[in-house]
A protein has these predicted regions:
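Catalytic loop of the DD-peptidase/beta-lactamase superfamily, centered on the K-T-G motif
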Residues: 1-30, 152-157, 161-165, 169, ...
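Generic structural signal for alpha-helix termini and adjacent loop/cap motifs
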Residues: 11, 35, 69, 100, ...
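Extracytoplasmic/secreted proteins, especially bacterial periplasmic and envelope-associated proteins
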Residues: 3-4, 53, 58-62, 73, ...
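Structural recognition of the beta-strand scaffold that forms the well-ordered cores
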Residues: 17-19, 50, 96-98, 138, ...
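Short active-site loop at a secondary-structure junction
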Residues: 9-17, 38-96, 131-142, 217-220, ...
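Residue-level signature of the cytosolic catalytic core of signaling kinases
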Residues: 1, 47, 74, 90, ...
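The feature captures the short pre-catalytic strand/loop hairpin that immediately precedes
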Residues: 118-130, 198-214
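Active-site helix/loop module of the DD-peptidase/beta-lactamase fold
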Residues: 45, 50-54, 66-109, 126, ...
């Protein structure tokens, strides 16, 4: 397996972590390159990285957990949780936020703008719709931030504390969150741009006391480790966090990402029907960091990789574009090796 990964990343000065699991067994777990060039700290499977939009599948899991607990219904109109909404948005449901079919705009400001929860809701509800709710898929980060608001309203606690209590703690994930893990700075990867210049750590940018401001909260920005993502995979396999019904809801293909395309969106996951079976995946990045989480449903396979330098002008590479090839190569090797067992 190491040879497969090396064939994709070895010549590209890859900096990050790769973890591959078959069922509950970790097949490969390795760090590459530097987490911090200045301090000469190497990346390891314990290094904390920004997950980007891989955060969305945790937000979706929190929503179906709340439904499992009887605290909300995904068919609830958002007005049940956000209060009065403009006439054009009265038909929007929680489920439409989950599937990016609410017709909302992608964002209502920059990720690092100091936007409070109240102002996020005000801006999101005031923004014109792209399409009539329920009629088309339009990826919306603001929709997932609204889900984080709904999670807080339905749970009576903060978004991060609910995830920590109901998802991360049962899965034995101690290194995932915004601020609750209280990491040392040296444990978190520094991000680098395409020129190799430091862009700091996620919390070196405008950051509230409890995590990122609300243009990012719920749709991105969680930090985690490869080891914790493996624990999440195991928790899904043994239904420790979400029961079978909840997981069927999570991984059901619901809306095509594009007309005539072969990829569908479920709740926080992109779903594909492939030669090795149904695949669920999501990626996330900001031009500096990039993460990709893939699960082959029914086979118990998982591939996670993350980098703190997604692109290189000097090297002429873009790992956001190469990521699918890396994941596909690893999955093919996993399936082939499983067939020989």
């Amino acid at each position: 397996m190491e040879n497969v990964v090396q064939s994709y990343v070895g010549a590209k000065s890859f900096a990050g972590t790769v973890l591959v699991a078959r069922g509950t067994d970790v097949v490969l777990s390795k760090g590459y390159g530097a987490a911090n060039l200045e301090w000469e700290i190497p990346n390891t499977p314990a290094t904390k990285f920004r997950l980007g939009s891989v955060t969305k599948q945790f937000t979706a899991a929190a929503v179906v957990k709340l439904e499992m607990l009887g605290r909300l219904d995904v068919h609830d109109p958002i007005s049940d949780w956000l209060g009065p909404v403009p006439t054009d948005k009265t038909g929007i449901t929680v489920q439409q936020l989950l599937t990016h079919t609410a017709g909302l705009v992608d964002a209502v400001g920059d990720d690092y703008q100091r936007l409070t929860r109240r102002r996020l809701v005000t801006r999101a509800l005031a923004a014109p719709l792209r399409t009539t709710p329920g009629t088309a898929y339009h990826y919306s980060n603001v929709g997932y931030s609204l889900l984080a608001v709904i999670i807080e309203k339905a749970s009576g606690t903060t978004y991060e504390r609910f995830l920590a209590r109901e998802l991360f703690r049962p899965a034995h994930m101690t290194q995932t969150g915004y601020t609750l893990p209280d990491w040392r700075r040296s444990e978190v990867a520094v991000e680098y741009d395409a020129r190799g210049l430091s862009q700091g750590r996620p919390f070196d940018h405008p950051w509230a006391a409890t995590g990122p401001w609300w243009n990012l909260r719920g749709n991105g920005g969680l930090l985690s480790t490869a080891r914790d993502l493996a624990r999440w995979h195991r928790a899904l396999l043994d239904h420790r966090v979400l029961d079978r019904r909840a997981q069927r809801a999570l991984f059901r293909p619901r809306v095509p990402e594009r007309p005539g395309g072969d990829s569908w969106y479920g709740y926080g996951w992109v779903l594909l029907d492939t030669s090795v079976g149904p695949v669920a995946w999501h990626n996330g990045g900001n031009g500096w960091s990039y993460a990709e989480l893939t699960r082959v449903l029914g086979r118990g396979l998982m591939v996670f990789w993350v980098t703190n330098q997604a692109r290189s002008t000097a090297g002429g590479w873009n790992l956001e574009r190469l990521g699918t090839h890396l994941t596909s190569g690893v999955v093919r090797r996993l399936v082939a090796s499983s067939a020989r067992l």
